[in-house]
């Protein structure tokens, strides 16, 4: 997984550097990059270690991308694939800038089934190119990462085969990178060919993904802060939106200690980018805790919603029952707690 993170970071961050350096030489402010990434993951049983590693590392990878200056617009998509006659052939989740939502979808991936080779690689890769709603601009960096251990079925007559898929990718300015897990001999030449045909990179990593959770002395403290910040969230929106927000908070609270810091950092980077665009000064800046909106405390702290403009029907039943005075006091306390915790 370390090699995968390094490959991803190199492709995402180093690729735009030349253009940024040119801007600096000309005295221009570097333009904000837009980056779109789709992970195409083999979710059969042999990939258990890698899938669990991805769940641990997705925040770290997003953090690495967002740390570049200026903070890029990042959208991530996911495709999980197995094979025909399995519980599913593919599960497609389109590009989203809501990293909390992507994390929730990734958490639902379980490595099961398989046991034989090959797998439905061609179908998954074709859907990454044709079903994902990629930005049509040539200025947007668009990357696919095919991660798996088994070669594609070449005997499915109704499949579009990978050589043709690579041609389609080129027409859409997509770069296809391949990550081979383990050392299955029949996979290596195909993974290398896909990367070569689609101007991408190939890397081989251990079947387990090489994930080692490294804790630091402050991890427990940050995990505690993560949970305390979650308590300050007031879900706001229609019933579906409030349900989604509650789900995100629950997943965040369960995040492993070593992942909590990366998650908070990602949200801080994204909030600062929004603040820069809207002209909010550093002294007034408050980081969001829930990606994708739906947190009234964040809306109030950022000035998007005024205390007197809170819509009753968008509140949970518990908060709705409060008198107007009680509600305002409660919300002011939550905003104050959020700011105190984020000092």
Predicted stretch roles:
Residues 10-18:
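Hydrophobic h-region of N-terminal signal peptides that target proteins for export
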Residues 196-198, 202-306, 332, 337-343:
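C-terminal "exit" segments of structured domains
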Residues 1-4:
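Positively charged n-region of N-terminal signal peptides that target proteins for export
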């Amino acid at each position: 997984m370390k090699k995968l993170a390094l490959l991803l970071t190199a492709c995402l961050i180093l690729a735009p550097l030349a253009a940024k350096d040119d801007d600096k030489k000309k005295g221009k402010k570097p333009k904000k990059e837009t980056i779109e990434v789709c992970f195409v993951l083999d979710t059969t049983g042999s990939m258990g270690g890698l899938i669990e590693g991805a769940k641990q590392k997705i925040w770290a990878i997003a953090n690495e991308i967002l740390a570049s200056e200026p903070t890029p617009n990042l959208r991530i998509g996911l495709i999980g694939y197995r094979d025909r006659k399995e519980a599913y052939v593919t599960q497609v989740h389109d590009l989203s800038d809501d990293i909390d939502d992507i994390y929730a979808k990734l958490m639902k991936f379980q490595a099961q089934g398989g046991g034989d080779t090959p797998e439905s690689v061609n179908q998954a890769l074709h859907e990454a190119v044709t079903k994902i709603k990629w930005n049509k601009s040539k200025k947007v960096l668009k990357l696919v990462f095919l991660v798996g251990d088994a070669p594609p079925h070449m005997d499915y007559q109704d499949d579009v085969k990978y050589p043709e898929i690579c041609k389609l990718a080129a027409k859409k300015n997509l770069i296809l990178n391949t990550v081979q897990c383990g050392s299955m001999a029949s996979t290596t030449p195909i993974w290398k060919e896909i990367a070569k045909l689609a101007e991408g990179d190939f890397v081989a990593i251990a079947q387990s993904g090489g994930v080692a959770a490294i804790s630091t002395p402050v991890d427990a403290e940050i995990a505690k802060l993560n949970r305390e910040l979650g308590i300050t969230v007031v879900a706001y929106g229609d019933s579906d939106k409030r349900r989604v927000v509650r789900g995100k908070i629950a997943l965040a609270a369960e995040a492993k200690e070593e992942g909590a810091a990366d998650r908070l950092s990602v949200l801080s980077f994204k909030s600062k980018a929004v603040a820069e665009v809207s002209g909010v000064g550093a002294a007034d800046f408050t980081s969001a805790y829930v990606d994708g909106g739906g947190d009234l405390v964040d809306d109030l702290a950022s000035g998007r919603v005024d205390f007197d403009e809170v819509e009753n029907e968008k509140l949970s039943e518990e908060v709705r029952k409060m008198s107007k005075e009680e509600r305002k006091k409660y919300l002011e306390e939550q905003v104050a707690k959020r700011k105190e915790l984020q000092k």
